[in-house]
Curated annotation (Swiss-Prot):
The lineage of its organism: Bacteria, Pseudomonadati, Pseudomonadota, Gammaproteobacteria, Enterobacterales. Its cofactor is Mg(2+). Gene3D superfamilies: HAD superfamily/HAD-like, Putative mannosyl-3-phosphoglycerate phosphatase, domain 2. HAMAP family: MPGP_rel. CDD domains: HAD_Pase (cd07507). One of its GO terms (biological process) is mannosylglycerate biosynthetic process. GO terms for molecular function: magnesium ion binding; mannosyl-3-phosphoglycerate phosphatase activity. Disulfide bonds: none annotated. It comes from Escherichia coli (strain SMS-3-5 / SECEC). Belongs to the HAD-like hydrolase superfamily. MPGP family. This is Mannosyl-3-phosphoglycerate phosphatase. It is an enzyme of class 3 (hydrolase).
């Protein structure tokens, strides 16, 4: 479909896509990450994780200095060379983590919804839930514009909770393992479009875009990509796009980083 020589941006989800859902291993994707880095193709990480978590992962993956999308699009970490852009080093969309937490605490106290947020527990508990080390688990609590939670109520109550959040200008989003509350104005798609427009403004040409994801919260991102890889995932709802033209969308047979590699193999060889 395209070559590594043309202007190209790769947007990638993390857990269940570039990273294995259980072990967080990414080695099957390492050859492609090296090839893209050598070809000066930016790989822009896009996740529900905090910017602190993602900056650590960026360095681990050899992607430091590039922009990234954190907290499902509520936070954009700017590229190191974008220091002249207003808001550097991060752009926050919507209300803050603290304000969202206040709303959730009020709903829990007054309307008796049952859930546990990451703010309710310590890093040892999060490490147990996620399989992360204590130091990495501590980074998951550094939210700036969203709240991560475990839902502990019925599906009927979830529908009521979602409606109440919508009334208050918030959205309730499902990730690979947890649920996330963020401002209704934020999203991976809006954040990706902003980054694409910034690259276009700086280079004078709109880059071709390829997105990879495995969960329902990746659908908005994949909808705005020129090409999309839907990595086989664990979520029972999966990913469904409005336009699933097979020349544009590839569903992998493999999961996690093996699927990530499969998707890159497909689009770079299908010329």
């Amino acid at each position: 479909m395209f070559s590594i020589q043309q202007p190209l941006l790769v947007f990638s989800d993390l857990d269940g896509t570039l990273l294995d859902s259980h072990s967080y291993d990414w080695q099957p994707a390492a050859p492609w990450l090296s090839r893209l880095r050598e070809g000066n193709v930016p790989v822009i990480l896009c996740s529900s994780k905090t910017s602190a978590e993602m900056l650590y992962l960026q360095k681990t993956l050899g992607l430091q200095g590039l922009p990234l999308i954190a907290e499902n699009g509520a936070v954009i970490q700017l590229a190191e060379q974008w220091q002249d852009i207003d808001g550097f080093p991060r752009i926050i969309s919507g209300i803050s983590h603290g304000e969202i937490s206040q709303v959730l605490n009020t709903l829990r106290e007054k309307e008796h919804f049952k859930f546990t947020t990451f703010d309710d527990v310590d890093d040892a508990t999060i490490a147990e839930w996620t399989g992360l080390s204590r130091s990495q688990a501590a980074l998951t609590q550094l939210h700036e514009a969203s709240v991560t939670l475990i839902w502990r109520d019925s599906d009927e109550r979830m529908a009521q909770f979602t409606a109440r959040l919508n009334e208050l200008g918030l959205q309730f989003m499902q990730g690979a393992r947890f649920w996330h509350v963020l401002d209704a104005s934020a999203g991976k798609d809006q954040a990706a479009n902003w980054i694409i427009a910034t690259y276009q403004q700086l280079s004078g040409k709109r880059p071709t875009t390829l997105g990879l994801g495995d969960g329902p919260n990746d659908a908005p991102l994949l909808e705005v990509m020129d090409y999309a890889v839907i990595v086989k995932g664990l979520n029972r709802e999966g990913v469904h796009l409005h336009d699933e033209d097979p020349t544009r969308v590839w569903r992998t047979q493999r999961e996690g980083p093996e699927g990530w590699r499969e998707g890159l193999d497909h689009f770079f060889s299908a010329r």
